[in-house]
């Protein structure tokens, strides 16, 4: 998005002319994940909210590197476990939010009988818009109780590069927490 596309409204610079204008205009629109559709930048208050009216922050690669390096300095090798636990708690909370949002957004009573890939894509779309990366879900071993997820363009891995060890502990925790709630079984 270029600055030429951003409109100034009074003291607020917003990608939309009014906060959540597109959501108000198209309440049943499900394909709202471009930058200009998904985020509402309110410069007068210094906030960024998304389509679901959740607060977001923008961070630089230096912030990600500093956060992880600082955590490793403070707690050493336990930093991976700590990030995993943070991700797991986040995943559990996000599953509760997602279940409520999804059923309301799409008008379903329950998603236990829906196509799992449909549900998962609806869950991950906001993460893509927020910069958490694209994914590929491999369900070829589902009959044995396995699902494999490959993350591409992860902000964490891209920022840190190849450091010779796993770095996406928060993602692993996020998936464990979300899927634990989804299937009602602890996967952590």
Residue ranges and their predicted role:
Residues 1-148, 153-170, 188:
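N-terminal accessory segment detector
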Residues 166-184:
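Active-site helix/loop of acyl-thioester processing domains in fatty-acid/polyketide metabolism
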């Amino acid at each position: 998005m270029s600055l030429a596309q951003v409109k100034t409204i009074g003291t607020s610079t917003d990608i939309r002319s009014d906060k959540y204008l597109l959501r108000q205009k198209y309440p049943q629109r499900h394909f709202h994940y471009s930058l200009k559709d998904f985020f509402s930048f309110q410069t007068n208050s210094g906030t960024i909210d998304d389509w679901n009216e959740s607060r977001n922050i923008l961070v630089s690669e230096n912030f990600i590197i500093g956060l992880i390096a600082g955590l490793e300095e403070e707690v050493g090798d336990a930093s991976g476990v700590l990030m995993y636990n943070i991700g797991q708690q986040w995943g559990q909370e996000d599953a509760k939010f997602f279940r409520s949002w999804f059923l309301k957004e799409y008008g379903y009573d329950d998603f236990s009988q829906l196509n799992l890939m449909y549900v998962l894509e609806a869950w991950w779309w906001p993460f893509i818009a927020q910069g958490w990366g694209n994914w590929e879900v491999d369900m070829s071993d589902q009959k044995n109780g396995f699902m494999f997820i490959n993350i591409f363009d992860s902000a964490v891995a891209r920022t840190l590069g190849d450091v010779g060890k796993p770095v996406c502990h928060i993602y692993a925790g996020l998936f464990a927490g979300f899927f634990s709630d989804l299937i009602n079984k602890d996967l952590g």
